[in-house]
């Protein structure tokens, strides 16, 4: 009969072996989980509310505005932008950017240095005038609780002074990135005399849906007129005080004056206006499955390659540095040997906005057209400089 100590020693060794095995297993699980979290982690901000604002206020950007000076480089020498210049004249867009005194130099000026210069008219709305940007001073208080008040005052000012300068009027934040060429392409077959507005359509609260404020929303001229002359100060559904979520209150007000919340998706059902940075839409599983975003989308939200139209218009929560990254990727980076053909803007029909069939290459640049476009841009910028 073996001594008791023999069994005790054998049991201890077995227990030790099992403990080591369990420890290794747990360690591997934790390590794998950590790796997966790193893989799906994001460098960008994920908002915990559909009405979050100011999350990039403390993200530092370049000390000075950046600009490219490669107009005469080999890659741009043979670039043909006549279609974009044609649409610049045909589809006039006024962009107004919601900002505040603290963001003028940290965020707003980087908007002006990138996509803002492609607006027919560019206005920055703040509570304090700034002649360098420039920014207009609205008689409102700052803070997220006053965004609806600022929005109402901005549209009233635009209706009063800038109604005839544009056909479409887009509102966005100072951390929104817009591709104006794609916005004009989307709007070019639509009438500014129709009561409609477009953006990223959310579905709670407002019966017909409403557009995400951060992704930007664009009003036709008729919609702007109805908003100011029939809605604000006239309808119960147009909230009189400064409270409420800006985009929700805008949706309620526009619905009350029979402005339709339009569908901005492309013919494949992919969205054009995006409430987050590209990474959050393109990479699956970055956004938590229990996040508000999934239940707020009017149309089923898609992840990965099906998330975004090839002619995407906007992205939100874009920090200053990323403004320049997107500017480079959209307007400067080119795959050598690949050229694009464009569908005739006269023949495009609604709902098939980027067919490859019946495509045509644009005509070559004309110096007179180029000078006309530069004049339009200069007038818009000059107008902005003298409004504050």
UniProtKB/Swiss-Prot annotation:
Its cofactor is Mn(2+). Disulfide bonds join 95-119, 238-253, 307-308. Pathway: Protein modification; protein glycosylation. A glycoprotein binds at residue 292. Glycans are attached at residues 80, 376. It is found in: Membrane. GO terms for molecular function: glycoprotein-N-acetylgalactosamine 3-beta-galactosyltransferase activity; manganese ion binding; nucleotide binding. Keywords: Disulfide bond, Glycoprotein, Glycosyltransferase, Manganese, Membrane, Metal-binding, Nucleotide-binding, Signal-anchor, Transferase, Transmembrane, Transmembrane helix. Pfam families: Fringe. Residues 347-368 have a biased composition (Basic and acidic residues). One of its GO terms (cellular component) is membrane. Optimum temperature is 37 degrees Celsius. Active in a wide temperature range from 4-50 degrees Celsius. Activity is not affected by storage at temperatures ranging from -80 to 37 degrees Celsius for 24 h. Mn(2+) binds at residues 173, 175, 316. Residues 31-388 are lumenal. It is a single-pass type II membrane protein. Optimum pH is 6.5. Residues 1-12 are cytoplasmic. Glycosyltransferase that generates the core 1 O-glycan Gal-beta1-3GalNAc-alpha1-Ser/Thr (T antigen), which is a precursor for many extended O-glycans in glycoproteins. Belongs to the glycosyltransferase 31 family. Beta3-Gal-T subfamily. Homodimer; disulfide-linked. This is Glycoprotein-N-acetylgalactosamine 3-beta-galactosyltransferase 1. It comes from Biomphalaria glabrata (Bloodfluke planorb).
